[in-house]
Amino acid sequence: MTQTIRFFLLVEAATFIIAALIHMGFFVTGYEHRQARVAESVIAGVLFGGLLLSLFMSDWTRNVAIVVQLFALLGTLIGIMTIIVGIGPRTVPDVVYHVAITVVLAVGIAVARSAPADSLQ
């Protein structure tokens, strides 16, 4: 179960890094957005930090994963709100990414919550 939780953290963090790079103008142009880039970079850093912490403190994996994914989910929901009110980027890829990563984060949280705390060492 520990490896599955870590896999979720790695994939989630990687997608936020890719999103931040896209909002920097890497890979494709026309999607630059400074505030989105900053938010995605912070979320990626928190998720990577949680992953690293789980590697060094494996008995903390479950709780750390829940906390960092909840943080990422909150940030994503704020991003969705900025799209709805018109301050965030409103492109189709942005909307699709926000919906998809919300689902992935929710599943990741459910997986971490379902893991027995004593089985993660």
How would you describe each model-predicted region?
Residues 1-121:
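Topology signature of small-to-medium multi-pass alpha-helical membrane proteins
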